Each structure stands twice: as C-alpha cells, then as structure tokens.
Amino acid sequence: MVILLETIQSMFKHLHWANQRILENLQNSAAENKQANNLFSHILHAENVWFTRLMGSDSSHLPIWEEVSLESCVEIVNQNHHNYAELLSKLSITDLDQVVSYQNSKGTVFHNSIREILTHVALHGQYHRGQINQLLRKADLEPINVDFIIFKR
C-alpha cells in the first residue's frame, strides 16, 4: 500500500510538470489557439472541482468549462499544485480508501474513494493534454511531450 501512495504522489508531480509544459507552450505560441486554451482551462477547473469535493465542500458553483486567460491559468496551476501537494503530504495509506460523497453539476450524488478520485484527476488531465497536442498538430505546431516516462528521465 505504501507503493500505491508513492505512485499517486508521483502522478501528481507529473501532473504539475505536464501542466507547466502546456502552459509555457501556450504562452510562447505566436498564434492563440482558443480551443487549446479552452481545454487547458477545463483541466485546471476540473482539478479545482475535484479538490473541493475531496475537502467535503460543495463544488456546484465552480466553473468546469469556463475559459480563463493564460495569466489566470498561471495562478490556477500554482494554486492547484499547492492544494494537492498539501493534501498528498497529509494522506495516510488508510485514507486512500475513505469514501467521499459529492454531487456532480447536475445534482446527482456519487460516492468514490479518495484513491479513485485522485487517480481520476491525474488521468483526466492526461486525456485533455492529448487533445491539446492534437490541436497543435492540426495547426502545424510541434506537440508537447508530456509522457510520464519523459518526466521521470
């Protein structure tokens, strides 16, 4: 079980590294890619929504698909990183199986373990970063390598 906690912590270090790489690329791009910005904003909002749920608070008022400026993305990336780093530093192995009850944006109640939620957050961002890379390729731009193994090298 200790290995599981270390793996989740490593996944979140990768998540932050990958977010920073995407953000830097979007900031340095000559042409604004509105779709890529929208997807990146969504990744960051979703991370915040899930953190709020993990804290036992209502997330229904939080945006999920609201596009924000790249300047705001910098702040959100840093805040999300701080929030999750603090949470992960305090989690014990037994905490991972604790069940969290929350409502989705439609008001439906769900119950998932902290382990399941943290795994979802890490994988959700990777999915959308892949979509961002697809948009970059379509615009004849170089995709950003955010593979986990690159992070570990």
Give residue spans per PLM region:
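Short, contiguous alpha-helical
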Residues: 9-66, 105-153
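Helix-adjacent hinge/juxtasegments
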Residues: 59-98
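Basic/polar N-terminal segments that are highly enriched at the extreme N-terminus
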Residues: 1-5
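Short acidic-hydrophobic surface loop/beta-edge motif
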Residues: 100-102
